[in-house]
């Protein structure tokens, strides 16, 4: 199993389901930071301003929001720099998708040296979000903070639960977009002024 989700799509009885964390299970006593995936904004029809989504996340109970797109921009820049190095093996394979990395590890280990040795955007976002929260709120310790990735991808949930390259993930929870969407849409409608 590489956590690709194909079995979920193919099961004629719809007996298989992706396992995400539930929003309700996130510890309310902790400082909760939402990490919306860049694709999250595409779920909202006629969204003119992403600030409605960002404010909505705060309104449903998150203490802060850190956009994964910020981390993706940094990873993109480091990837450009990495690609300029002389002794890299081609083809170069991005490490952002846990399904691709797991497939290579299990079935094509001879390609492992081609995977870019770089932290995926969700890991960098989780790390940066925690560091920024502790800088803003010096009373917080790392364990006082819950990093919650809002994801379209069931593989990311497995990836976070199983750790990043054998290490604990910087992300604590992975909540499905659909779980957050319905909570958020009601709050966003209230925030829109006629």
Predicted features and spans:
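Iron-sulfur-associated redox domains of electron-transfer enzymes in respiratory
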Residues: 19-194
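Iron-sulfur cluster-binding cysteine motifs and their immediate structural context
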Residues: 2-22
